[in-house]
Amino acid sequence: MQKFECTLCGYIYDPALVGPDTPDQDGAFEDVSENWVCPLCGAGKEDFEVYED
């Protein structure tokens, strides 16, 4: 699965990691609620871009 990066603060959403920062168990970013926000800065889902390692 792809990782996504917050363009405002640099937080990396990694669907392989399940924990308090991930909104659901399967982790696919496309399936995350539109109401979800970055756990570090509160940016909306629209402020994330595909992260290239």
Curated annotation (Swiss-Prot):
Cofactor: Fe(3+)
Record's cofactor remark: Binds 1 Fe(3+) ion per subunit.
Keyword annotations: Electron transport, Iron, Metal-binding, Transport
Function, as annotated: Rubredoxin is a small nonheme, iron protein lacking acid-labile sulfide. Its single Fe, chelated to 4 Cys, functions as an electron acceptor and may also stabilize the conformation of the molecule.
Domain Rubredoxin-like: 1-53
GO biological process entries: alkane catabolic process
Source organism of the structure: Peptoniphilus asaccharolyticus
Protein name: Rubredoxin
SUPFAM superfamilies documented for this protein: Rubredoxin-like
The keyword Transport is assigned to this record: yes
Chain sites annotated for binding Fe cation: C6, C9, C38, C41
Membership in a protein family: Belongs to the rubredoxin family.
Keyword Electron transport assigned: yes
A single GO molecular function term of this UniProt record: iron ion binding
Record-linked InterPro entries: Rubredoxin-like_dom (IPR024934), Rubredoxin_dom (IPR024935), Rubredoxin_ET (IPR050526), Rubredoxin_Fe_BS (IPR018527)
